[in-house]
Amino acid sequence: MKSDQSKDTQVAFMARIDKITVEETIPLRHSVLWPTKPPSHVCLPEDATGTHYGAFLPLRETPVAVISLFLEDLPLLRDGHDTEINLKSENSNSTIISGDEDSYRPAQQRTVRFRKFACEPEFQGKGIGTQLLVHVLSRARIELDAATVWCDARVTACGWYIKRGLVPFGPTFYKGPEEYVRMRIDF
């Protein structure tokens, strides 16, 4: 029997990853991330300056997963002191100690943020989201010269991101009823 971790990262489908228009991201962003809100809720003011990607399966014209990249600095902690985060998710019962604010944004290094990462529920757990994330992390590092990539992640997904090399930083916070934590990966 396979462990939960190998099941979670098992690749069941090989997706084709392509750059797409922001308009192609909206239906999936809306249906997966905020289905009870109007579609305009998933549109970002910076969408015009972002780079958007979709994961496609054979014989499908629409993406089954989407993600958007933006050049954006890491946020600094308000107080500049070490912060302890207690995260309890299905895959993690860990306490993470964050460094001081200088560890969040190294001087003169480019940071990239990914936002609005969504995968159709029927394709979650099949490796498509992992393929898409690995692809955009590579693109951020190679094409955008990113030293760090970060995101705001729902706390319920924190374990998934940790398995893929991201680490939480800063305190948790809310967007509406959803609890979030910032996560990052350094290259």
How should these model regions be labeled?
Residues 54, 61-72, 80-90, 94-105, ...:
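Conserved beta-strand in the GNAT
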Residues 140-154:
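Conserved GNAT acetyl-CoA-binding A-motif
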Residues 119, 125-138:
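Conserved acetyl-CoA-binding loop-helix of GNAT-fold acetyltransferases
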Residues 39-41, 50-55, 66, 111, ...:
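Short hydrophobic/aromatic beta-strand element in the GNAT-like acyltransferase core
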